[in-house]
Amino acid sequence: FADELVFRYTGEPGIARTKIAYVSELGTARELFVMDYDGYDPRQLTADGFLNLMPRWSPDRRFLVFTTYRNRNTQDIDMIELATGKRWTLVAQGGLNITPVFSPDGNSLAYSSSHEGNAELYRLDTKTKAVQRLTTHAAGDLSPSWSPSGRELVFTSDRSGGPQIFLMSADGSNVRRLTFEGDYNAAPAWSPRGNW
């Protein structure tokens, strides 16, 4: 009811029914949890003794994608359905597979992978499981973030020496550098509406 009132008077969605995904250290493992926005009702999602990191919500809030470190040599990207607890692997290419993030429509997943040697950005079609390589550069490309429209990705790359922020079309074309101040600019995150 509170969320409906907030929306009616502000046009913005309320937070009363929102959840927060987080990582908790349990012994040597890092497990995924969700809790209510006020800290109540924590629920453990993983209990496998692995390092499970970097959870990201699907746009419909039914799924979380995350990086799981099953052994020292590979990091896979898994997805878990919150209602059922069903978990499956989306990316298991060998090497480092990190920083997964859903497109705004939920039809694609952008991530960074080093399975061919160097960290590059890839796009996974969540329905067909087809994978498209987005970047091909001698430098490392990491931390993709979708524009609200889903037409562009911003990411971190050290292709200009130190880490800087770059922008490209969602198909990997039209790559251009955005930051020129400072020696270390990383971990870009697009505002939900794109206006900040």
Feature map (PLM): residue ranges:
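A flexible loop/linker signature enriched in serine peptidases of the S9 family
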Residues: 13, 24-31, 47-50, 67-77, ...
